[in-house]
């Protein structure tokens, strides 16, 4: 029997989400991205299909985990039982070496009605961040970073650790919390037959996610009974993380695959072999940000200034598309364009 007492742990939200998607794909699921829900098809007042920008998707039941748009998706189905408004949170991220000696875990202030407060936290990858603040918004697309927000975060963080090295920040960003009208999670069967909501997920949304999943599964099975998949594959292929290996282990890996010897992202020591593996994996990366989230190429101090063009070239080659078709993240987020013939000859 293990006698060590576990007092705490951290996990990477991004890695966890990617792993769940990869597990689903290797068990027969299909992931469709950049796909807008436009309506629902019903028969006898039960949902039978979803209308989308990429065609009709037949469905015995639909789980609505639409984030800040969950209320809009529910309304398309005829469910007006809840509303969602966005609450923006801004963050500042530091270089790995910046605050490593100052922070070893999570430093919390006293929580308030809106949030747990502006905190200081280390990540599983070694960075430190401060944030978030909490600003109620009208626009569900507004993830802008503001000077006022940055001042608020820095002043609050300095109350916890006065000598934070603010000059070592490498990027700022913002995200949106999905706040329900009731202020609570919206979980379970909708008044519309065949629709199940998992909405209004504020903190502690990640911590609650496994329990929320069990609640949704229970509700779905009560509506649409199904057997457990007998040949379910839970284990995912494990690719080596080059930067975590010893020099001897790295040398052996390069002998097997020379692309491990080509470091594309020097800030995070990410190799071409790792990037290719991320592209070819189940639910593989299709964009520059997709590669970044899976491998950390572009997450270092230069924020992709060095490796960004090289990652783009690798994506184009592996996906069999021209460089101008490689996206940063969403539709129309092109990084490169074909030279206009009208520009020929210009200085």
Residue spans for each PLM region:
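Single conserved hydrophobic/aromatic residue that forms the stacking wall/gate
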Residues: 1-8, 12-13
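Helical element adjacent to the flavin cofactor pocket in flavoenzyme catalytic cores
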Residues: 10-61
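Short cysteine clusters
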Residues: 12, 265-267, 302, 307
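C-terminal catalytic lobe of FAD-dependent flavoproteins
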Residues: 19, 115, 124-125, 136-263, ...
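Hydrophobic/aromatic beta-strand patches that form the interior of the parallel beta-sheet core
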Residues: 32, 63, 196-198
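Flavin-dependent oxidoreductases
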Residues: 40-131, 135-145, 155, 164, ...
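Iron-sulfur (Fe-S) cluster-binding segments and ferredoxin-like electron-carrier domains
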Residues: 141, 271-282, 305-323
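Short Fe-S-cluster ligation motifs
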Residues: 292-309, 325-347
């Amino acid at each position: 029997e293990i006698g060590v007492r576990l007092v705490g742990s951290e996990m990477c939200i991004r890695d966890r989400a990617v792993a769940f998607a990869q597990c689903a794909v290797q068990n027969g699921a299909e992931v469709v991205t950049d796909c807008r829900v436009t309506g629902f098809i019903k028969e006898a007042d039960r949902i039978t299909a979803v209308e989308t920008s990429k065609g009709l998707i037949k469905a015995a039941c639909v789980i609505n985990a639409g984030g800040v748009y969950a209320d809009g998706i529910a309304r398309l189905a005829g469910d007006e039982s809840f509303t969602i408004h966005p609450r923006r949170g801004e963050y500042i991220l530091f270089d790995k070496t910046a605050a490593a000696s100052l922070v070893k875990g999570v430093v919390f202030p006293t929580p308030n009605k809106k949030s747990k407060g502006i905190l200081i936290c280390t990540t599983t990858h070694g960075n430190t961040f401060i944030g978030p603040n909490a600003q109620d918004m009208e626009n569900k697309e507004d993830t802008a970073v503001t000077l006022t927000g940055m001042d608020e975060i820095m002043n609050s963080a300095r109350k916890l650790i006065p000598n934070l090295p603010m000059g070592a920040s490498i990027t700022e960003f913002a995200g949106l919390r999905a706040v329900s009208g009731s202020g609570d999670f919206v979980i379970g069967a909708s008044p519309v037959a065949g629709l199940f909501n998992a909405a209004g997920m504020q903190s502690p949304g990640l911590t609650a996610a496994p329990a929320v999943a069990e609640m949704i599964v229970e509700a779905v099975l009560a509506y649409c009974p199904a057997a457990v998949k007998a040949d379910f594959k839970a284990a995912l292929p494990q690719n080596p993380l080059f930067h975590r290996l010893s020099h001897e282990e790295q040398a052996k890996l390069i002998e097997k695959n020379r692309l491990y010897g080509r470091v594309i992202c020097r800030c995070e020591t990410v190799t071409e072999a790792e990037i290719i593996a991320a592209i070819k994996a189940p639910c593989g990366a299709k964009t520059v940000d997709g590669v970044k989230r899976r491998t950390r190429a572009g997450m270092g101090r230069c924020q992709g200034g060095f490796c960004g063009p090289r990652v783009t070239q690798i994506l184009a080659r592996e996906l069999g598309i021209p460089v101008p078709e490689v996206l940063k993240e969403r539709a129309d987020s092109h990084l490169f364009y074909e030279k206009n013939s009208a520009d020929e000859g210009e200085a």
